[in-house]
């Protein structure tokens, strides 16, 4: 993707930013008679930009350390939401202190402490060793690296809006909230198109740290201006026609909490669904988060973007369509599924945030309002990041959230009916919805997880695994599959002869099948395999061979031993090493592998950290002089051949591409593409078939510090 092609959305975002700041300051200066409003506008905008720029930055930084799983982003979002809640709580408590000068002094002191924790570059000591809980380690890593700066950035929005209402009496602070969301949106749009392709991860972290220092100085100026402002009894009185005070609304804080929590759940659940079988990359994290923020901008900017009755109808239709799509599963195309999921997320966020705006209080309760909203967002993060993996064995949080949103839609529609309002108290409506949602929760917990053909289901930090019984369509042979999401990671036929037959991506006609059948046939071999799956490659082991599997997911190891016999049936000596393969190989002494296999891709998701120059140096250290590196690059969405060819060229190896066609080997093979790399041409001549490709191809260099999947998008 050329930089010029990325200018248009970035230019539009920058224009929108300056227009919004100019519009806000012009209106505010006219009403308050104070020209200092631009300082508050720029400070809040900068804080929001930094707040959302650091999220993909740090998530990408640590992604290689924790196996490249979507759960890394979910845990990062959870930690950031909890810090956001902490920042809002701090702003709420600080605003209760009567003296403006005391508030300014406390905040200035904390800003100074935060500046001392820079830069936000994660220390190598935080890399996992393999025997700790990844979720806890990610939490501690983020708190140690960016906890204090992020906490203070989170507090900036509500705190400066409160200070602004004192320094510029007569002006509404709520437009500052829309302005902050524009800053957040610009951060998200600019990251994948500007900062990620142009700067290394370390350079991004240092640049962010410098911008934080500039923000801190600007914030100190705002605090000084507030300290100099005279004490006032009011905080501004401009209200939109739909604004209601807390006393006018039944159960106001419960509604604020629910309406903030549901979009948060939908955001994380939708992101999981989209990333699970495409790629764990900032670009795909950012699209849902951008839609989430855009709904905030539109609803808080003006009530003209939210029309209640049409939005209720649109939301109900969108929710029903998404439920139907999820029930049909793979019958819908991938592009259609993603478009519907993202469209539904935006509609739901518009509905929930539009209702939040209708219920917003006067500025006197501003910090309490934002605190409750952030509590709802944090509760949604906890529900998806911690509660759902403990309670559900599948990804049921999305359908459950869809049901909850539909109930809120119905309840909102009924509350507009005056006759219904007279007959049914608000608490009764809330209780009825809670009961129905509880019944759905029981269904997903107790019944939906037990399909008749599913032998076992496990869910952990790395995703959902299933072992299923099935039959081969061509000849009705009974078989057993290990499935991650909707992708088969290993298959074994259960009849006596078929249990020793390799299939799917590892059949005898595949690139890896040809290699393991022919290479060094006259002597014992040492074989390394990154990614266990069902253990299919163990069937290629001969007496005297040693096969060493590396597997990051402990549930994969458990299911492979429990439900498949490949490991037990192999004639080779088998070792299964738990932990991230790259980290384990980096710590191990040289293994002198004759063949090293990279097959750690979950569906079409790409663990980028396994295809960088730094990773390649580790593999080369463990290969024998005539060793072959076999890399599985089958993928619907990304062309990984340029990346692998770059690795081969950098290491002085020859690279060949071996393809296998669906239905080969008696109908048991899948379409597969393997790349074989070696410094010994004779070894490749033996391993590759006559159809292996050696055609020249463009190259794309990836390093740990600088890589971009947009460069290899098909």
Where are these regions (language model features)?
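Alpha-helical transmembrane segments of multi-pass membrane proteins
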Residues: 3, 11-12, 16-691, 697, ...
């Amino acid at each position: 993707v050329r930089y010029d092609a990325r200018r248009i959305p970035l230019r539009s975002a920058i224009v929108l930013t300056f227009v919004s700041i100019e519009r806000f300051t012009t209106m505010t200066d006219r009403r308050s008679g104070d020209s200092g409003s631009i300082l508050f506008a720029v400070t809040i905008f900068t804080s929001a930009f930094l707040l959302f720029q650091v999220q993909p930055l740090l998530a990408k930084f640590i992604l290689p350390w924790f196996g490249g799983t979507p759960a890394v982003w979910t845990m990062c979002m959870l930690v950031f939401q909890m810090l956001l809640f902490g920042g809002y709580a701090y702003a709420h408590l600080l605003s209760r202190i009567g003296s403006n000068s005391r508030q300014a002094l406390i905040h200035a002191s904390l800003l100074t402490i935060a500046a001392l924790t820079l830069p936000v570059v994660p220390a190598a000591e935080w890399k996992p060793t393999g025997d700790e809980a990844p979720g806890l380690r990610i939490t501690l890593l983020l708190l140690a690296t960016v906890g204090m700066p992020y906490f203070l950035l989170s507090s900036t929005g509500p705190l400066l809006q409160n200070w602004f209402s004192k320094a510029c009496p007569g002006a509404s602070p709520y437009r500052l909230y829309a302005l902050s969301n524009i800053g957040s949106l610009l951060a998200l749009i600019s990251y994948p198109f500007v900062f990620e392709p142009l700067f290394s991860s370390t350079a991004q972290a240092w640049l962010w740290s410098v911008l934080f220092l500039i923000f801190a100085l600007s914030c100190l100026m705002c605090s000084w201006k507030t300290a100099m402002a005279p004490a006032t009894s009011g905080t501004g009185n401009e209200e939109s026609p739909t604004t209601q005070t807390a006393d006018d609304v039944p159960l106001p804080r419960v509604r604020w909490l629910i309406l903030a929590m549901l979009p948060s759940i939908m955001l994380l659940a939708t992101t999981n669904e989209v990333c699970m079988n495409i790629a764990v990359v900032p670009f795909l994290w950012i699209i849902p988060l951008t839609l989430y923020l855009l709904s905030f901008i539109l609803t808080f900017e003006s009530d003209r973007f939210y029309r209640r009755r049409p939005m209720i109808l649109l939301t109900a239709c969108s929710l029903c369509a998404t439920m139907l799509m999820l029930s049909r599963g793979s019958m819908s195309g991938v592009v259609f599924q993603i478009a519907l999921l993202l469209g539904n997320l935006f509609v739901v966020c518009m509905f929930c945030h539009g209702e939040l705006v209708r219920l917003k209080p006067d500025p006197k309760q501003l910090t309490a309002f934002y605190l409750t909203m952030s509590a709802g967002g944090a509760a949604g993060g906890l529900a998806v990041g911690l509660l759902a993996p403990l309670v559900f064995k599948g990804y049921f949080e999305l359908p459950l959230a869809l049901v909850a949103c539909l109930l809120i839609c119905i309840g909102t529609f009924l509350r507009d009916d005056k006759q219904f309002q007279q007959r049914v108290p608000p608490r009764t409506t809330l209780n009825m919805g809670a009961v129905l949602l509880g019944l759905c929760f029981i269904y997903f917990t107790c019944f939906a997880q037990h399909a008749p053909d599913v032998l076992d289901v496990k869910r952990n930090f790395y995703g959902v695994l299933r072992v299923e019984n099935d039959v081969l369509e061509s000849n009705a042979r009974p078989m057993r599959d290990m499935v991650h999401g909707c992708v088969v990671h290993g298959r074994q036929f259960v009849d006596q002869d078929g249990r020793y037959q390799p299939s799917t991506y590892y059949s005898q006609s595949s690139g890896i099948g040809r290699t393991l059948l022919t290479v060094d046939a006259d002597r014992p071999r040492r074989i390394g395999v990154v990614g266990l799956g069902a253990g299919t490659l163990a069937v290629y082991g001969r007496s005297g061979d040693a096969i060493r599997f590396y597997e990051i997911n402990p549930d994969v190891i458990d299911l492979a031993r429990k439900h498949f016999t490949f490991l037990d049936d192999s004639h080779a000596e088998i070792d299964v090493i738990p932990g991230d393969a790259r980290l384990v190989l980096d710590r191990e002494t040289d293994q002198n592998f004759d063949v090293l296999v990279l097959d750690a891709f979950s569906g079409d998701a790409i663990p980028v950290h396994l295809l960088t120059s730094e990773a390649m140096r580790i593999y080369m250290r463990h290969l024998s002089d005539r060793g072959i590196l076999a890399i599985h690059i089958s993928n619907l969405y990304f062309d990984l051949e340029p990346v692998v060819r770059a690795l081969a060229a950098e290491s002085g190896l020859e690279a060949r591409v071996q393809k296998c066609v669906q239905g080969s080997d008696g109908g048991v093979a899948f379409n597969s593409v393997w790349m074989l790399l070696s410094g010994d041409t004779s070894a490749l001549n033996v391993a590759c078939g006559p159809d292996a490709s050696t055609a020249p191809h463009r190259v794309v260099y990836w390093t740990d510090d600088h890589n971009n999947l947009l460069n290899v998008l098909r």
